[in-house]
Amino acid sequence: FLIPKLYVFDDQNKALFFHSANEGRVWTNIHQNPKVCFTAYEMGCITPAKLACSFGLEYRSVIVFGSLSVVQDQTEALRVLQLFMDKYAPHLEANEGYLPAIPDELSNLAVYRLDIAGWSGKQDKRSMGMPGAFRYEATAGEPHAHG
């Protein structure tokens, strides 16, 4: 199965972490088979061309293979949840912009650790300096012309 997840990479442990409910599809599947693969990508600029099939895209992507396990240690789970806050809300301060996770909250969720067995990555570098280059986000939501 495939399911989108927010993640953090912990350089200290060379592992990826996710969190989810402590029941449901993810929980059931990893207990049946902990072998997983994970993918992440980042899209950059689009470079136009005269022919539609000649357009280019700047990107970076990675596919990771490994085993997923549930983090059992409460201190480690709370540390990982703080990594999520540091990554996704770096502009907020703990105890000012939000209250950090506490042990009681762990009863309703699971923190998962993906130990990396291997990975494969790919990228295509382009430049916003190329003629006509643009970012998709800049055009999202604009009406499209049909001729």
Outline where the language-model segments fall:
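Short hydrophobic-aromatic micro-motifs
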Residues: 16-19, 38, 62-64, 112-113, ...
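Short, glycine/acidic-enriched capping/hinge loops at junctions between secondary-structure elements
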Residues: 2-4, 50, 125-127
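Short, structured beta-strand-loop surface elements
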Residues: 22-82
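Non-catalytic surface loops within mature trypsin-like serine protease
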Residues: 11, 42, 70, 116-118
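Short beta-strand segments
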Residues: 1-22, 30, 38
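C-terminal edge-of-domain segments
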Residues: 72-147
